[in-house]
């Protein structure tokens, strides 16, 4: 039986797993990593994706690997792309 649980966005994970436990607002995070607050707000609200530059800044600030946020974002994109795309299942490996 397949469970269709909604996949979190990278912005939700950034907020819930990194910002909230450390009591960091979007304003404070933007100031600390030297990016516009709108960039952080857009990521949190799923209006934009994490760029390489922002990923590197977030990684440095939160003490994770350089690719952590980009890898997470790409994993989420792949999982969401697979949902409901039956034609992918019809492709045969060579």
Would you name each region that the model predicts?
Residues 47-60:
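Short, basic-rich loop-to-helix N-cap that marks the start of a DNA-contacting helix
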Residues 36, 47, 62, 73-76:
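The DNA-recognition helices of helix-turn-helix-type DNA-binding domains
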Residues 1-24, 71:
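A short, Lys/Arg-rich alpha-helix, primarily the initiator
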Residues 39-42, 60, 68-71:
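Residue-level recognition of specific faces of alpha-helices
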Residues 19, 30, 59:
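The alpha-helix within a helix-turn-helix
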Residues 23-42:
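Short alpha-helical DNA-recognition segment
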Residues 70-94:
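Short, charged recognition helix plus adjacent turn
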């Amino acid at each position: 039986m397949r469970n269709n649980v909604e996949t979190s966005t990278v912005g939700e994970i950034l907020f819930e797993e990194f910002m909230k436990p450390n009591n960091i607002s979007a304003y404070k995070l933007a100031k600390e990593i030297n990016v516009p607050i709108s960039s952080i707000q857009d990521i949190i609200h799923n209006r934009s994706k994490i760029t390489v530059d922002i990923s590197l800044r977030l990684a440095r600030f939160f003490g994770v690997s350089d690719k952590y946020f980009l890898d997470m974002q790409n994993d989420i994109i792949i999982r969401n792309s697979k949902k409901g795309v039956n034609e992918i299942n019809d492709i045969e490996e060579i």
